[in-house]
């Protein structure tokens, strides 16, 4: 095999004088340790070392090294810090090949003879983990790695970027981060032309195009593109959560998840959106938030073409088509399509309600539920539709409303072909075919398909009308009744017929009106078979033409 000589300068890292000035004395010492560690890794590989004849005296060699640095400095304002720091003789070369190793105990003695690093190098060539974190009992082979790990406990972050103020625990991460400010992305994907700052990012990205997921979980069969993702996933099955937050006692499967969580207690939100000023504790949260301003929704459902900002939202949405519910409650066996829905449900069994409303005393399991509830008292509706200006208490209500403007109805009933804009409306409709009425009124025994219908019905017995119109003081049993009534005062008629442009203040009235154009008469008399467009027409017909029979 042909030899390919590799000089010491080939494994060194060059810095400009300006970059070197960024580092303080501690950082420079650490850099020396890192470079020394990198070099020992080369030594530990199957490389052979040869030395040129020692033609130069030590004094002359030092002169030439200094002259080399001065010439390099003049030429391109950079210098080889590796050689500058270690003062290693330039006569040593590394050659690839199958020659036998030199007959010495460890060739590293020739390199490390001027340093106290030989014991460290020998220890690194074994798998021994001599350095242990006493707090978490975690072992490390290198003292440098232990030092970096301990900074997680102490909170010391020594490497700060002068451009953006971001700080790093590990020096390599600091150097890696500085490339962000250059906007240089030299590694381009041939499949989609997407560019990356780091070669490792390109390699990870290219697996997406191949669709390959070589790492499979033996317990559930789920496959992953990366081994680290499989390792994280397997902790779900064993229920292992070894990392505990000392502030609140919450446990985590991964150490980094605990570190991210701890920012909640410290109130640290270093990542700020330049568009709206909103701050976030995690960089990934800021990245996802930015998509709101850009309107980017890269994850699209192939069945209904609905798009999402995040991939996990697409996965959860696809379960509405497949009916899959992988998250099951151990207490009652109820299953859910979303993990977050299961967590919310579990609080029913614990009966834990930590958040009390000061206005009415009602308690809630989550702070977000309390915030939403308080808007009933304040009347706040912060979410506005840009199409028609209508405002809503909850963002989810706004999303549901916006479908009206798109005319998109992706959820179709397989039995009758009727389509709906929301999956909840489809499920409600399907109960008509099933004939299910599981909700029974204890007062009169009447049954209903929906719990909301039962609650509305019960107000007949109680006489409760909690929703009052501020304009005329008229009271209603439901908030939807109040909303419809308000349109009398405002004159709003949001439901418009596409055939004749006639508008209505209620959707059911639009539906009734559209039968004029379609000729559909869905209301059929069971006595004589005569059909009608509207329910009230059928009622009138039955009273006048079949009144006697109905009374009998």
Curated annotation (Swiss-Prot):
This is Zinc finger protein 404. It is found in: Nucleus. Residues 6-78 form the KRAB domain. Transmembrane segments: none annotated. Keywords: DNA-binding, Metal-binding, Nucleus, Repeat, Transcription, Transcription regulation, Zinc, Zinc-finger. One of its GO terms (molecular function) is zinc ion binding. A zinc finger (C2H2-type) spans 131-153, 159-181, 187-209, 215-237, 243-265, 271-293, 299-321, 327-349, 355-377, 383-405, 411-433, 439-461, 467-489, 495-517, 523-545. Belongs to the krueppel C2H2-type zinc-finger protein family. Pfam families: KRAB (PF01352), zf-C2H2 (PF00096), zf-C2H2_6 (PF13912). It comes from Homo sapiens (Human). PROSITE patterns: KRAB, ZINC_FINGER_C2H2_1, ZINC_FINGER_C2H2_2. One of its GO terms (cellular component) is nucleus. InterPro entries: KRAB, KRAB_dom_sf, Zinc_finger, Znf_C2H2_sf, Znf_C2H2_type. One of its GO terms (biological process) is regulation of transcription by RNA polymerase II. The keyword Transmembrane does not apply. May be involved in transcriptional regulation. It comes from the Eukaryota. The keyword Metal-binding applies.
């Amino acid at each position: 095999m042909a030899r390919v000589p590799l000089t010491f300068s080939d494994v060194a890292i060059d810095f400009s004088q300006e970059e070197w000035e960024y580092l303080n004395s501690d950082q420079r010492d650490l850099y020396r340790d890192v470079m020394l560690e990198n070099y020992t890794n080369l030594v530990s590989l199957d490389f052979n070392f040869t030395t040129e004849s020692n033609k130069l005296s030590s004094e002359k060699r030092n002169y030439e090294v200094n002259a080399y640095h001065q010439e390099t400095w003049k030429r391109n304002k950079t210098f080889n810090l590796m050689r500058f720091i270690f003062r290693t003789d330039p006569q040593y070369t590394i050659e690839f090949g199958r020659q036998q190793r030199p007959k010495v105990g460890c060739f590293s003695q020739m390199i490390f003879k001027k340093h106290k690093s030989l014991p460290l190098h020998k220890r690194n060539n074994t798998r021994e983990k001599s350095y242990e974190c006493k707090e978490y009992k975690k072992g490390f082979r290198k003292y440098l790695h232990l030092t970096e790990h301990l900074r997680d406990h102490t909170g010391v972050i020594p490497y700060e970027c002068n451009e953006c103020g971001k700080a790093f625990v590990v020096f390599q991460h600091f150097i890696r981060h500085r490339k962000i400010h250059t906007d240089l992305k030299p590694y381009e994907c041939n499949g989609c032309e997407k560019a990356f700052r780091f070669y490792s990012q390109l390699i990870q990205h290219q697996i997406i195009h191949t669709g390959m997921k070589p790492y499979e979980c033996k317990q559930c069969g789920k496959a992953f593109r990366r081994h680290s993702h499989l390792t994280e996933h397997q902790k779900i099955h064993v229920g292992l959560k070894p990392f505990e937050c000392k502030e609140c006692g919450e446990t985590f499967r991964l150490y980094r998840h605990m570190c991210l969580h701890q920012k909640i207690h410290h109130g640290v939100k270093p990542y700020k959106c330049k568009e709206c000023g909103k701050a976030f504790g995690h960089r990934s949260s800021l990245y996802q938030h930015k998509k709101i301003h850009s309107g980017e929704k890269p994850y699209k459902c192939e069945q209904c073409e609905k798009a999402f900002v995040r991939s996990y939202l697409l996965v959860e949405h696809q379960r509405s088509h497949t009916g899959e519910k992988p998250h099951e409650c151990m207490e009652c066996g109820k299953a859910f399509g979303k993990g977050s829905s299961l967590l919310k449900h579990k609080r029913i069994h614990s009966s834990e309600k930590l958040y009390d409303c000061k206005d009415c005393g009602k308690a809630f399991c989550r702070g977000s539920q309390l915030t939403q509830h308080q808007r009933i008292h304040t009347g706040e509706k912060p979410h506005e539709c840009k199409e028609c200006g209508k405002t809503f208490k909850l963002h989810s209500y706004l999303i549901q409303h916006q479908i009206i403007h798109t005319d998109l109805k992706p959820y179709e009933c397989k039995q009758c072909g009727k389509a709906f804009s929301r999956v909840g409306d489809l499920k409600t409709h399907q109960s008509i075919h099933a004939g299910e009425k599981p909700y029974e009124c204890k007062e009169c025994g009447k049954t209903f398909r929906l719990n909301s219908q039962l609650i509305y019905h019960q107000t007949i017995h109680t006489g409760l009308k909690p929703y009052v119109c501020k304009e005329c003081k008229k009271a209603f049993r439901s908030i939807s009744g109040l909303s419809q009534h308000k349109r009398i005062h405002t004159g709003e008629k949001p439901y418009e017929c596409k055939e004749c442009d006639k508008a209505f203040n209620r959707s059911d009235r639009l539906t009734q009106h559209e039968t004029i154009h379609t000729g559909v008469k869905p209301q059929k008399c069971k006595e004589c078979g005569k059909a009608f467009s509207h329910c009230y027409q059928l009622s009138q017909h039955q009273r006048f033409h079949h009144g006697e029979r109905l009374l009998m």
